[in-house]
From Swiss-Prot:
<keyword id="KW-0539">Nucleus</keyword>
<dbReference type="Pfam" id="PF17083">
    <property type="entry name" value="Swm2"/>
</dbReference>
<protein>
    <recommendedName>
        <fullName>Nucleolar protein SWM2</fullName>
    </recommendedName>
</protein>
<dbReference type="InterPro" id="IPR031391">
    <property type="entry name" value="Swm2"/>
</dbReference>
<dbReference type="GO" id="GO:0036261">
    <property type="term" value="P:7-methylguanosine cap hypermethylation"/>
</dbReference>
<dbReference type="GO" id="GO:0005730">
    <property type="term" value="C:nucleolus"/>
</dbReference>
<comment type="similarity">
    <text>Belongs to the SWM2 family.</text>
</comment>
<dbReference type="GO" id="GO:0008033">
    <property type="term" value="P:tRNA processing"/>
</dbReference>
Amino acid sequence: MIDLYNYSNLEGLLDGLTDLNRIPKEYSAVLEPYFQNIARNAHLKSRALKICRSNFHKWNEEGAKTVNPEIIRRCLNLWYVLKGKEYKKLKDPPPADNIIKDEIDVSYVKNLNVVRLEFDEFGKLISNPLENLILEEVEVNDFIQE
């Protein structure tokens, strides 16, 4: 069995992390397991943090002129995995790329009969999923500690 997370593979990933020709944008979404394995090795972790700091510095100095926003997103994700917290010193970070995946025009769809199906823990269809829903009026002050 091939170990995808061996030292040389992880080192190669760090070598190509900032090169979109070596690791295209489409692969950014699947890098997290590699980042988690980089975090387990002190030398690779140190090297990764250095790469991220360098790119963050370039971004803060010159923005998207010198650093592709996708590289900054990768470094932000890597930083979060390695440090367990977000990098806060970045000026005008690139927008998140996962907010809108695709816009779909549904104006041409007419009389679409869509029904939400819900299943119980045994996989049986629930005919009326809100049948046992109980709504109660609750005083918010009961839950606020004074």
